[in-house]
């Protein structure tokens, strides 16, 4: 993920408002590989900056997604997750006990829709989600 300074410059270049609240969200995402929910980002940001609103967090995440700087994932956990790792192609491991989400490096390629089922369909993205229990929850 880009640095807070790079994201600040990008937002300004695109005519988007840059506020201390948004810069805090940039920083929280930059230092995070846990695929946080928008709500957990809000809780952390609000604890440090009481002027933070949930709407600001949602709007900032939406703008980051529109700029291609984060992916917003629905992993079936009940909350949308924010993935700041857009540089590396990867899939996800989701623990069904604790909800932890980890990146899984893309070690298998070539997954595609069989030609007899395509019927003119063009695949833009493939996301594979493995559900199970993490090491801590398995013990």
What label would you give each PLM region?
Residues 57-67:
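Basic amphipathic alpha-helical segments that dock to polyanions
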Residues 2-15:
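Short, Lys/Arg-enriched N-terminal segment that forms or immediately precedes the first helix
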Residues 20, 31-37:
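Short capping segments at the starts of secondary-structure elements
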Residues 23-28:
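Pre-recognition alpha-helix immediately N-terminal to the DNA-recognition helix
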Residues 40-46, 57:
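A short acidic, leucine-rich amphipathic alpha-helix
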Residues 66-139:
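Non-DNA-binding regulatory cores of transcription-related proteins
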């Amino acid at each position: 993920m880009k640095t807070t300074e790079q994201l600040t410059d990008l937002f300004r270049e695109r005519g988007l408002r840059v506020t201390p609240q948004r810069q805090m969200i940039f920083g929280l995402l930059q230092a995070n590989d846990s695929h946080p929910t928008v709500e957990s980002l809000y809780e952390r940001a609000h604890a440090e900056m009481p002027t933070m609103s949930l709407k600001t967090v949602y709007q900032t995440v939406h703008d980051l997604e529109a700029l291609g700087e984060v992916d917003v994932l629905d992993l079936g956990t009940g909350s949308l997750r924010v993935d700041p790792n857009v540089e590396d192609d990867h899939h996800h491991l989701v623990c069904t006990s604790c909800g932890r989400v980890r990146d899984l490096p893309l070690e298998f390629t070539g997954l595609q829709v069989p030609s007899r089922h395509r019927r003119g369909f063009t695949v833009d993205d493939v996301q594979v989600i493995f559900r199970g229990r993490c090491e801590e929850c398995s013990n």
